[in-house]
A protein has these predicted regions:
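Acidic two-metal-ion nuclease catalytic site recognized across multiple nuclease folds
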Residues: 222-249
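Mg2+-dependent endonuclease catalytic cores in nucleic-acid-processing enzymes, primarily RNase H-like
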Residues: 15-16, 33, 37, 78, ...
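Conserved RecA-like P-loop NTPase helicase motor core
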Residues: 214-216
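C-terminal interaction surface of TIR/SEFIR-family domains
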Residues: 207-210
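An active-site-proximal beta-strand-loop segment
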Residues: 62-77
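ATPase catalytic-site recognition across NTP-hydrolyzing enzymes
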Residues: 1-64
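Intrinsically disordered or highly flexible coil/loop and linker segments, enriched in small
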Residues: 35-39, 70-71, 117-118, 182, ...
Length: 249
């Protein structure tokens, strides 16, 4: 949205303010968009994550935005590192912010460094039909260039045809959160990106009056983990058509 007082609130000033107050306060005071917490998700669980060595694998899932701007009018970019252990999904750390494409690419390497050699990490990036030209024309060349500087990361595009964002988050994540089976890493509680993720969960509503790019990213990671678990379990099978990713980097 746009500020209700653009003459006073320049883009630079708005971004500086947005970084220092909550999304709820920012939307209400500067965007004339009052929000309430807990309409769908009442509480987000923080807890200790198991050592990454205990995981079969981890997934770094990224939700890009086609914007290459750091201003508040653009969508949030997101990239989070998730794992699964003993029936619970864990969000170890991640990033959620308005950033340039160059910074977004760096996030993948930051998550690689966080995981180090403790666990195999699978890297995915959302790539629906609308995003595909941008992914091929912008991100693939950027990842190729960064690979020459910092090493190769194998990234797979998630090309599935997704249901609407709210329904996916409510249907796939709300039950997990309510049952205590989706946990945010308490060691990262002061991380502003993780705080932003918690707030987006709490402000989720059917009208989508506030950003939900973070929860959308987590839903993507959980979905990928579930697909991988189903293939690892002996005798497991999947009903439906398999989607092949033909644009693996």
């Amino acid at each position: 949205g746009r500020s209700t007082w653009p003459e006073k609130n320049t883009e630079e000033r708005i971004r500086r303010i947005e970084q220092t107050i909550s999304t709820k306060a920012f939307q209400q005071e500067y965007m004339n968009n009052p929000l309430s917490e807990g309409e769908v998700i009442k509480e987000v669980i923080w807890g200790k994550c198991p050592p990454m060595q205990r995981l079969q694998f981890a997934v770094a899932y990224a939700d890009p935005s086609p914007s290459n701007a750091r201003n508040k009018a653009s969508s949030f970019k997101a990239d989070f590192l998730l794992g699964y252990c003993d029936g619970t999904f864990y969000v170890y750390t991640g990033f959620l912010d308005h950033v340039t494409n160059d910074e977004f690419v760096d996030w993948f390497y930051n998550l690689r460094d966080y995981a180090s050699e403790r666990v195999q990490v699978y890297y995915f990036i959302e790539n629906n039909s609308l995003q595909d030209p941008f992914y091929e024309q912008v991100f693939l060349p950027m990842f190729a260039a960064r690979a020459r500087e910092r090493g190769f990361i194998g990234i797979t595009p998630d090309c599935r045809c997704k249901p609407p964002k709210f329904e996916r988050i409510e249907g796939n994540l709300e039950p997990l959160i309510r049952q205590g089976r989706l946990v945010l890493n308490i060691d990262e509680r002061e991380n502003p990106h993780m705080k932003r993720l918690e707030e987006q969960f709490l402000l989720l509503n059917r009208q989508m009056k506030s950003p939900a790019d973070g929860p959308d990213c987590i839903e993507g990671g959980v979905w990928i983990i579930n697909q991988k678990i189903s293939t690892l379990n002996e005798g497991s099978y999947t009903i439906g058509q398999r989607v092949r990713a033909s644009k693996r980097f």
